[in-house]
Amino acid sequence: ETVMVLLALAFAGCRGKSSQLADFNKQLYAPEYASGFKIERADGRQSVLVSVMNPWQGADSVTTRLFISRNGEPVPEGFDGQVLEGDAQRIVAMSSTHIAMLDAIGETARVVGVSGLDYISNPDIQARRDSIGDVGYEGNINYELLLSLDPDLVLLFGVNGASAMESKLKELGIPFMYVGDYLEESPLGKAEWLVALSEVVGKRAKGEKVFADIPIRYNALKQKVSGAVLDAPSVMLNTPYGDSWFMPSTENYAVRLITDAGGDYIYKKNTGNSSTPIDLEEAYLLASEADMWLNVGMANTCLLYTSPSPR
């Protein structure tokens, strides 16, 4: 009995021992295709550090961090990022792609809140829509509803800067993590973010297993297309946003996906690392010349875009 007490005290002392941020330098998962995140650990610790690099367009040397404290281990000294106590059980997902990644590992039941419920097609989310909170869109967030959902974590994304939700979430004491999947240059890099979300819910091993099969299947299809003799159809992307039409860079994952599928992206002027706005007249001209038009939102006819426009 004395031995057991001593062991318990030793364990408690080890668990409560503080660590330095610099101790979390052992790679727990090294992404093969994604460049926007890394998962690290410290020797003798169950807690992990998820770092997200340059999480929005135009970000330069920006890193946001989420410390996932496990087994009651304390936050490292000097850490000023977000802290998640244990695995996330209640998640608010601000993008439908976050839900798709959680769905890939069978964990959508953890989603308690979303942005734009009517535009999410996931069967589990729609089956539970009466119990899922729609917190609204950035710039018009229902924070009272968000608080009532009692989330462990909010999954965010940034467009041309930090999310407008960030400061309010800090004020409310709600942890968040940026998901920069859409900034990846390859479809496989985008897909690999499911491993980062798997870590957040304590299912990294499952996430790694699910992802491992994706490059195999993707590259097999890519090889099949490259061996076919065909004329590449020209492809237009996206829909109007206000008075502009945002066209992805030729290095964007969506354009890479089109190329790998045997298509020809119609707009080659943007070779940077972010989408660029063009005026509606140029966009409509491109669309009229394209063989295909993808990512058209909820529209099923061109009239939905041409009839409201006086031009």
Predicted segments with their positions:
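A short, structured surface patch at a secondary-structure boundary
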Residues: 48, 54-147, 153-158
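Bacterial Sec-exported substrate-binding components of ABC uptake systems
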Residues: 14-99, 206-235, 302
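Conserved small/polar residues in nucleotide/adenosyl-binding loops
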Residues: 305-310
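Solvent-exposed loop/turn segments at secondary-structure junctions
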Residues: 97-100, 117-119, 159-163, 182-187, ...
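Bacterial Sec-dependent N-terminal signal peptides
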Residues: 1-19
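Extracytoplasmic substrate-binding proteins
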Residues: 90, 152-154, 162-244, 268-269
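Flexible, glycine-rich surface segments
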Residues: 224, 230-304
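Stable alpha-helical elements in mature extracytoplasmic
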Residues: 87, 97-101, 107, 142, ...
